Regions:
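Active-site-adjacent beta-strand/loop module that shapes the phosphate/pyrophosphate-binding cleft
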Residues: 9, 80-104, 116, 139, ...
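A structural signal for short, well-ordered beta-strand segments
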Residues: 14, 76, 95-97
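A short coil-to-beta-strand element that immediately follows conserved catalytic motifs
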Residues: 69-79
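NUDIX/MutT-family hydrolases
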Residues: 96, 106-139
């Protein structure tokens, strides 16, 4: 019997704040809010998309595609395992990202029903995975120390 490693998708997400320090969140098909970002592309032969060379490259590309925002990946915030559906696990990686286009309204891709900007005090009441809330709280805490 040969060894077959578990293969989980890796989703790289951004905590991105606009010029008013509001965090950008996207509303998904599960009726949850989530951080923008997406899957690490492994490239051919598994698909037609070119491979991402780093997690930072992934999050920067995904933000452009999903929201139209240009960002620069900064500090790695967290990694955690999320099970959006029974038996389906995803490795989530979150980054603190600097928005290079902070005055640009976010676009909404076909993957989400809407995009909204939330103030820090609004985040705890939102329906979203706790891992995202931890990452958002970490960014706000770090920025208060600056």
């Amino acid at each position: 019997m040969s060894y077959q490693p578990s293969l989980w998708p890796v989703s790289v997400k951004a905590v991105a704040l606009d010029h008013q320090s509001r965090v950008l969140l996207l509303h998904n098909e599960r009726q949850e809010w989530e951080l923008p970002g997406g899957r690490l592309e492994i490239g051919p032969p598994s698909g037609s998309n070119p491979a991402d060379h780093s997690l930072e490259e992934t999050v920067e590309r995904e933000l452009r595609e999903e929201t139209g925002w240009a960002v620069k990946a900064g500090t790695l915030l967290d990694t955690w395992i999320y099970e959006p559906l029974p038996g389906r696990r995803v490795l989530i990686v979150t980054y603190d990202c600097t928005v290079l286009t902070p005055n640009t309204p976010p676009a909404v891709s076909h993957e989400h029903s809407r995009a909204e900007l939330f103030a820090e005090h609004e985040v705890p009441r939102l329906t979203m995975p706790d891992g995202y809330k931890r990452s958002i709280a970490a960014v706000y805490a770090a920025r208060k120390k600056r």
